[in-house]
């Protein structure tokens, strides 16, 4: 058994608290913010993202664009059977008012 040592300050970073709801988890936002700021400085107004699987990345892109005054365009694959988790993610996207473009999934 590992002994417990006292008098050590341990700092813990909670990614789940860095961006409060309705934002997605921090891990989906931390890298994209600076990238989108640079695109905005370059005059970009629309940011496209193609969702390739069931992930939170589209949610992160939509949130970050809304925060920065950009317009997200999410290309959304349409599957024969839509898993419940994907329905949940799509609902999360919509609260940030992206343009959602359905695309045929293979």
Segments from the language model and where they lie:
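A short, small-residue-rich loop immediately preceding and capping a beta-strand
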Residues: 43-62, 68-77
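Positively charged, low-complexity intrinsically disordered leader regions
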Residues: 1-45
């Amino acid at each position: 058994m590992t002994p417990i040592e006292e008098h050590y300050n341990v700092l813990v970073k909670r990614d789940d608290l860095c961006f409060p709801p309705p934002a997605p988890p921090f891990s989906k936002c931390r890298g994209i913010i600076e990238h989108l700021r640079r695109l905005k400085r370059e005059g970009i107004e629309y940011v496209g993202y193609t969702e390739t699987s069931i992930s939170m990345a589209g949610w992160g892109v939509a949130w970050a664009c809304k925060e920065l005054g950009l317009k997200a365009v999410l290309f959304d694959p349409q599957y024969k059977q839509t898993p419940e988790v994907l329905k949940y993610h799509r609902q999360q996207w919509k609260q940030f008012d992206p343009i959602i473009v359905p695309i045929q999934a293979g």
